[in-house]
Every structure is written in C-alpha cells, then in structure tokens.
Amino acid sequence: MPQTEEAFGTPDTREFDYAVRARGISKSYGDVEALRNLSLDFPRGQLTSVLGPSGCGKTTLLKIIAGLLSPNSGEVEVNGKPVTGPGPDRAFVFQDFALLPWASVIRNVAFGLELRGVAKSEREGIAHKYIKNVGLGGFENSFPHELSGGMRQRVGLARALSVDAQVLLMDEPFSAVDEQTRRKFQEDLLSLVQQENKTFIFVTHSIEEAVYVSDQIALLLPRPSRVSEIIRPTGIRNKGTDNIRRDPEYLDIVDRIWGSLRDYVE
C-alpha cells in the first residue's frame, strides 16, 4: 500500500514547521528487518501517534529518535541537527514507569534536573509545578510503592516535562493502567499538548487512543515495515474531550484504520 497524505479526515492545508525529521531509516536485528527506508516528519508543537501492529518497528523508531539506538542507514534530525545520541532536547516516558524506588515523588521528578546540575531550590520549584500539573499535588513526599500504577506513570510524565525538552517521546505510556485511568490520562494529555508547546511522539497499539489524542497519525505496516498512511483528524480536534468519541468523523476514522490493519493482525 503506498504512503498517502490526508488519508482520512478533513483535509489540512497548513504548512508545518517540523521539529523532528526521519529520513531513509533502516534498522535490522540480525536477519530481522525492523525498519526499511522509513521517512517521517513530526510537526512542531503537535502530537503524532505512531500506530501499527506488533512487530512493525514502532518502538525501534522511537528509540532511534531518542538516540538510544543507531540506524543501519538513514538519519534523524531534531531542530535541524542530526541525532548522534541522547540529548537534552528529548525526553523519554517509558512504558514501565522507570522510577527510582528509593526516592520520593519530588526527587524522582527533579532527578533529570539534578543530573544537569540545577540548584536544589530551583529544581524543586520546577518539580512542584509539574507534579501539580499532572494531578499529583499533595503526593510530593510519597514513594513509588505507595502509588497506584496510574500515579506512577504521572510521576514519569512530570519528570519528562520538568527537564523542558522540546520533544517528548512516549512509548505506550498508558498500557499498564486500567481503562478509566487511561481515559483520564488521554484527556490530560490533550490539555498538556495545548499548554506546553512541545512536540509529542506517542507510540500506541490502540486505534481509538491514537485518533482521540493525535494531531497526526503515522500508520506503520510490517513486512517490510514502512509508513503506509499519514492521517490528520483535524475535524475532531476542537470538539471538546467529552464529544470526540461520539463524533461521526472519529468513528469513521477508527473504522477505516482498522480496515487497513486487519490483515496484518496475527
């Protein structure tokens, strides 16, 4: 299936400023080809979901953008500069929380700032701000084992936001929480995208989640892994969080994406 722009949804005629650009990315693990000649642009200040079935290279692409993996060929640029490794312009929100078990919430959130040499009073002030922004005010002195899975993931998100990276990379961050918590996270994420003016790159297996939270959806298909379609659900972005899932365009996009993926689900 060829790559197509504006596959579904209201046509978007805006010209974009791209924060992240991937060009001709190929990556193999031994004889297993994870990505082949993949190119993809990520508009600045927007949330792009990378969606596709298991084994299509979503997490591999995210780690290459983060600088945690090197491609066999091709290049990623962030703000016009080639990615050669991890950098302060990118922050990663992990699927498994990746918190320090012996550290309090505020220490976990401030940890990245501590590594950068930010003074204690300044980093704690920044940490307090983002702890409040993600809905954890009052839990600053709690420890990870005292928190629910959803609360621990909020700590991870606050930590990523606190370092003021321009690009936030999120690897299925809501997969380990229950459905009610997941929906609340999705609503909060929409607010954060509007407030923070950062570029979010969001890996998910959930079609419904991708359509709900995204300004742009990159649909990846396997064998070989490639970008099949770029979808911009612009018609539902201003419907309000309570109305998006009831909108006919939302339902149509979800259904059409499933039609594209059905044959690749094992």
Residue ranges, per PLM feature:
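Non-catalytic connector elements of ABC transporters
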Residues: 2-9, 243-266
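ABC family nucleotide-binding domain
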Residues: 6-208, 213
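Short hydrophobic beta-strand elements within the C-terminal catalytic ATPase subdomain
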Residues: 78, 219-220
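A general structural signal marking secondary-structure boundaries and capping sites
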Residues: 72, 165, 221, 261-265
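Short, glycine/charged-rich "phosphate-handling" switch motifs in NTP-dependent
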Residues: 216
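Conserved acidic donor-binding loop of glycosyltransferase catalytic domains
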Residues: 134, 220-221
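Conserved beta-strand-loop-alpha-helix hinge in the C-terminal portion
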Residues: 222-252
